[in-house]
């Protein structure tokens, strides 16, 4: 089974959006038995909190369930447990590396590395959850293409 961990700062906006958008794509492709998806934070600020209302609004509008999701922090052991550690921006990469240590297998990457490169803007600061969703969707589509090869 392929295991993917999406990572952002607080695990309430971008990474849970990516987690559930990707799960939806995987389910529609009939790959749920081959790919496992989760998400986590690099910080402890939001641990135990549900997804942000902006993320919930996007997921609700798409009919995508996020039941039972609460923010958790990335752990050092996640490096051994996951095949892909997919961050939303360069800041997340730096902070994730501080938690997991060395990356000899090259598991750390950014979601938009699968869709032309760049960072996914944090809607916590921009307030633009629609733009974040478009970037997340594009990145997840690119990642799924790689996984299906």
What are these language model-derived features?
Residues 1-81, 145-149:
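Conserved active-site segments centered on acidic
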């Amino acid at each position: 089974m392929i295991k993917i961990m999406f990572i952002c700062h607080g695990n309430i906006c971008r990474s849970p959006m990516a987690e559930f958008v990707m799960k939806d794509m995987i389910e529609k492709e009939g790959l749920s038995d081959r790919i496992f998806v989760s998400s986590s934070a690099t910080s402890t600020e939001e641990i135990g909190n549900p997804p942000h209302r902006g993320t919930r609004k996007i997921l609700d509008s798409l009919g995508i369930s996020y039941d039972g999701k609460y923010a958790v922090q990335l752990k050092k052991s996640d490096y051994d447990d996951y095949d892909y550690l997919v961050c939303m921006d360069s800041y997340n990469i730096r902070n994730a590396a501080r938690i997991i240590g060395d990356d000899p297998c090259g598991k750390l990457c950014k979601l938009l590395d699968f869709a032309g490169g760049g960072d996914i803007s944090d809607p916590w600061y921009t307030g633009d959850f629609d733009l974040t969703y478009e970037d997340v969707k594009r990145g997840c589509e690119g990642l799924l293409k790689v996984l299906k090869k």
